[in-house]
């Protein structure tokens, strides 16, 4: 019995190690006026039936007063189709925004608004932008707002994504690999630079 338990434990450890080694991880530094204020870790993990993308960020920003901003995202594809996504955006440990979508569910939710029917025309999401250049994609499904948003080719290997509230992100690629994201917001601009 002890031998069986030991062999089972070793097999579980080997399985976990195989999963970790198959994940693709990319890291970005978050800069505000060339000062390092945080980091982003994005991961793409193949599953038996598709792919899971995760992204976590942590930033310490001074906007009127010091704020710790954390975000997390999990997006899942099954057989190439978007099946679920969940996001959370926290400022000083208080939930500022969150969203949730599950394929087949009648309702989607973006905090703090009421639930709604989620309709989309594309399988491309912001999480995929960390790992793939969106060549020929006119829209990107933005998990935080659960809407398709316009993506425009703004130069060679450069794309501009416009959100419903008119916020803008600029994505810059080199040889198909994301190098930087320029984030334009009302009170500040940030740069996510590949680490």
List each model region and its residues.
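Absolute protein N-terminus
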Residues: 1, 22-24
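Bacterial N-terminal signal peptides that target proteins for export
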Residues: 1-8
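Generic detector of short, locally flexible boundary/turn motifs and exposed helical patches
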Residues: 21, 38-42, 49-53, 63-68, ...
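N-terminal mature ectodomain segment of secretory-pathway/periplasmic proteins
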Residues: 24-100, 176
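Solvent-exposed helix/loop surface patches that form functional interfaces
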Residues: 83-195
């Amino acid at each position: 019995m002890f031998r069986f338990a030991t062999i089972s434990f070793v097999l579980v450890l080997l399985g976990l190690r195989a999963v970790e080694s198959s994940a693709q991880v990319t890291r970005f530094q978050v800069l505000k006026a060339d000062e390092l204020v945080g980091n982003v870790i994005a991961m793409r993990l193949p599953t038996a039936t598709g792919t899971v993308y995760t992204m976590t960020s942590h930033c310490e920003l001074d906007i009127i007063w010091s704020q710790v901003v954390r975000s997390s995202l999990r997006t899942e594809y099954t057989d190439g189709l978007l099946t679920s996504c969940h996001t959370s955006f926290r400022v000083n440990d208080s939930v500022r925004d969150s969203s949730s979508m599950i394929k087949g569910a009648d309702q989607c939710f973006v905090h703090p608004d009421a639930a709604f029917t989620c309709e989309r025309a594309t399988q491309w999401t912001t999480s995929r932008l960390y790992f793939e250049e969106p060549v020929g994609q006119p829209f990107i499904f933005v998990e935080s707002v659960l809407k398709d948003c316009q993506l425009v080719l703004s130069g060679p290997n450069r794309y501009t994504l416009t959100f419903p509230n008119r916020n803008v992100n600029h994505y810059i690629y080199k040889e198909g690999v994301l190098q930087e994201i320029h984030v334009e917001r009302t009170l500040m601009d940030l740069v996510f630079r590949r680490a």
